[in-house]
């Protein structure tokens, strides 16, 4: 920005305007910004004049998918939303992710999928392998060292440390639209380029965000949807390996998810939600993937039936 524009920028800022490059986001300060640390951090990240140079690799994506398809896991023989058998329900969700990965690869994204399988039965594991064979990228299946939801969470987070790439941590009951992976990569790279800082993307708005924990947000316009700033997410999210490594203290206790006596220590509130004190969080409106577990876990404005029927 030349000297004339700098002077004009200072004058216009008093009236609530900011001069920015056309392709950049322009966030305006809100009243009582000091009373909302999350919004204040978001505004300052986009308003910062001097950007910190970061050399992290954001051109490569690793996807970690946790699977566990067996009779022991299922409480019922069928899913209440789709009405199909649990194994069919989960395998179709896995297929939706594979379709989305292939769509991203068609758009020149460099991706590897690692499946962390927690004792799926032999028939289901064979079906998972068959699905993976249609992938247009590298993939592998890793048998988790210990059984249990918390152990697989801990293991796939630990896997990401020191890898220097984007990471998407996902589980087998998320239904993805074909554009999901490609759009999350594009949005992450675009924001990272503008603010020179890492972020976290939750693929859908948190199920509690309009009830128990409603709060104001910035809304950013993307190419195909809007993106809302968030301070809550599940353990399914998109970020960078350096975030996992730098803030490992917020990941270690995920091993207690599902633990009868210590499960509270592994909750999102006690673990990865603390990341939002340090990095920006976003979720797409409408969602690019949904937790297809129950009616209560669905985000608004998302027709999951159409996505389900198209697979």
Residue ranges of each PLM-predicted region?
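Membrane-proximal basic amphipathic "stem/tether" segments
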Residues: 1-46
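C-terminal catalytic/acceptor-binding lobe
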Residues: 37, 239-311
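Short amphipathic alpha-helices and their capping/turn segments at secondary-structure boundaries
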Residues: 37-62
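Hydrophobic targeting segments
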Residues: 60-65, 97, 111-115
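A conserved hydrophobic helix/loop-capping motif in glycosyltransferases and polysaccharide synthases
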Residues: 62-89
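Active-site-proximal specificity loops/subdomain of glycosyltransferases
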Residues: 77-78, 116-164
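Short, acidic, metal-binding catalytic loop of nucleotide-sugar glycosyltransferases
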Residues: 80-109
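Conserved catalytic core of nucleotide-sugar-dependent glycosyltransferases
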Residues: 157-161, 166-168, 175-251
């Amino acid at each position: 920005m030349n000297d004339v524009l700098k002077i004009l920028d200072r004058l216009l800022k008093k009236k609530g305007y900011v001069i920015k490059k056309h392709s950049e986001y322009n966030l305006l300060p809100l009243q009582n910004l000091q009373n909302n640390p999350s919004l204040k951090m978001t505004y300052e990240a986009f308003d910062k004049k001097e950007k910190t140079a970061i050399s992290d690799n954001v051109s490569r994506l690793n996807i970690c998918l946790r699977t566990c398809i067996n009779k022991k896991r299922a409480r019922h023989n069928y899913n209440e939303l789709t009405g199909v058998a649990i194994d069919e329900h989960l395998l179709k969700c896995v297929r939706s992710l594979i379709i989305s990965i292939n769509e991203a690869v068609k758009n020149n994204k460099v991706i590897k999928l690692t499946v962390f399988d927690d004792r799926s039965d032999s028939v289901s594991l064979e079906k998972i392998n068959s699905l993976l064979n249609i992938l247009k990228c590298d993939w592998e299946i890793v048998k988790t060292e210990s059984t249990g939801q918390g152990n697989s969470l801990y293991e796939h987070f630990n896997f990401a440390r020191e890898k220097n790439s984007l990471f998407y941590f996902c589980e087998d009951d998320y239904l993805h639209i074909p554009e999901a992976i490609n759009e999350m990569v594009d949005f992450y790279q675009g924001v990272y380029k503008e603010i020179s800082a890492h972020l976290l993307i939750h693929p859908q708005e948190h199920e509690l965000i309009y009830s128990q924990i409603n709060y104001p947000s910035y809304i950013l316009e993307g190419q195909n949807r809007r993106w809302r700033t968030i301070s809550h997410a599940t353990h399914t999210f998109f970020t960078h390996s350096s975030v996992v490594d730098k803030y490992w203290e917020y990941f270690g206790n995920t091993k207690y998810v599902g633990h009868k006596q210590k499960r509270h220590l592994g909750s999102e509130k006690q673990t990865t939600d603390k990341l939002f004190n340090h990095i920006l969080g976003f979720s797409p409106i409408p969602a690019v993937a949904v937790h297809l577990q129950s009616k209560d876990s669905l985000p608004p404005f998302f027709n999951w039936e159409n996505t389900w029927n198209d697979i």
